[in-house]
Amino acid sequence: MDASTINSLFLIGALLVGASILVSSLSSRLGIPILVIILAVGMLAGVDGGGIIFNNYPTAYLVGNLALAVILLDGGLRTRVASFRVALWPALSLATVGVLITTGLTGMVAAWLFDLSLIQGLLIGAIVGSTDAAAVFSLLGGKGLNERVTATLEIESGSNDPMAVFLTVTLIDMIASGQTGLHWSLLTHLLREFGIGGLMGLGGGWLMLQLVNRINLAGGLYPILVVAGGLVVFSLTNALHGSGFLAVYLCGLVLGNKPIRSRHGILHMLDGMAWLAQIGMFLVLGLLVTPHDLLPIALPALGLALWMILFARPLSVVAALLPFKAFHGREKGFISWVGLRGAVPIILAVFPLMAGLPDAQLFFNLAFFIVLVSLLVQGTSLPWMAKLLKVTVPPDPAPISRSALEVHVTSEWELFVYRLGAEKWCIGAALRELKMPEGTRIAALFRKEQLLHPSGSTVLEVGDMLCVIGHEHNLPALGKLFSQAPQRGLDLRFFGDFVLEGDAELGAVAALYGLKLDGLDAKMPLAQFIRQKVGGAPVVGDQIEWHGTIWTVAVMDGNKIQKVGVRFPEGTRPGPGLFL
């Protein structure tokens, strides 16, 4: 390869990446997921568009695995362990039982539609059986979904790849060897994938944490060290026949939930690297497909995609979540709809091509078509479906910016900046009147781009910018402090007519609003009553019905319900009650 060819490759690569970034700005205007736009750029530049011929499947496999490792590492770093209290076991059930059921249901229909053997149909089902972390992390961000739904979908997408990879590799081996029966050794293989992946991920994350916190480097090198360490964990786990995808996700989870040096620098750079990984991966996958090859299979492939979206995924979700009573029908419906397929199925579809199986090109084209339909149909309608099924909650007021204060190696101090608009209740109040959360301090006050030297008597005005020092766990309290109403920062349109304290006794609440206890313990706290009704770990937005009234979890303090909203039937509204 001469210098001219190398320069041409650099130019083409840079133009494609740049075009993807620029065109992605149309995503929000058109309501189309960014990943679809990037795929489209790759397809337009490919053999049926710009004429770039790319059919190197091993290279696509390499790029795809590298990109997914970076994306999963970034996803793990941003996942809060606290969310596991409501979603760990349901997500694992979806990642195992759900994938198995989806594979079986999809495989049977695929075999019938394309006149294949059952085992070939099941291979198609396995290839497209798992949700994609890149698609889920990208499309769920900023949608305001309740914690149970968000955590379940994110943990599922980060942990269901081992099952899909295991099923795909197993079925390829069976087809290649002519084997038609299953053996108990397959279960051992699956347990080994999960076991080694889990141990390597947790152990590798702990070792990386010790290394980052003990070694002194230039600030810009810590993110690179974390990425390198994540890739080491990923590759070593694969070499030991474990799940590298699960391992790198857990490695990020450990690093993201412990005090770590240069935390904000790591997260900031990983965000950019994850975006680059997504762009590069979907560009390569777009180049890899030949669009005119999709036309002959378009009708049956569309039928298979719709079967997955409307039947296979919902049935698998209902079955997998059957033991978990906390999930309402609306939440199950939304989780069913967000069975987003992305890069993983396309990468898994490369496996049969590399193994030289008959009909391997059909498997690849089918996987690509299903991914395209999934992103266009499910990804585009996600915000609308969230509103329809009422799984969103009002967002907490957030600072306009936040930055780290690295006063020591593992410092978790941050600087939060709040801009005070005309709707803020604290306008006209003196600083001494603000009940700041314990452990926080106002560090600076800017007014009309000028730094003031505030005192307790300084009165806040519209447009002021407050700089507050605190920790991440102070954000909910600070958000309420700088909300739109004095002690009514909660969105009453969502939570109800009144908001009650969670420790209010049920007997007092019933007497106040003329409700019947029906044998319930009058001394029972309202929070405990709602927890029992929910049937699992509650989250903000959970609702129950009692005597025609709707009771909504409004504020959580860890695992404890702190405030509850109550909405009465239309035309009825009791007295002031315990209005807060």
UniProtKB/Swiss-Prot annotation:
Function: K(+)/H(+) antiporter that extrudes potassium in exchange for external protons and maintains the internal concentration of potassium under toxic levels.
Keywords, in A-Z order: Antiport, Cell inner membrane, Cell membrane, Ion transport, Membrane, Potassium, Potassium transport, Transmembrane, Transmembrane helix, Transport
Record field: catalytic activity: K(+)(in) + H(+)(out) = K(+)(out) + H(+)(in)
GO molecular function, one term: potassium:proton antiporter activity
PROSITE patterns, sorted: RCK_C (PS51202)
Transmembrane segments: 6-26, 34-54, 57-77, 86-106, 108-128, 162-182, 193-213, 217-237, 240-260, 269-289, 292-312, 334-354, 362-382
Compartments, as annotated in UniProt: Cell inner membrane
Protein name from the UniProt record: K(+)/H(+) antiporter NhaP2
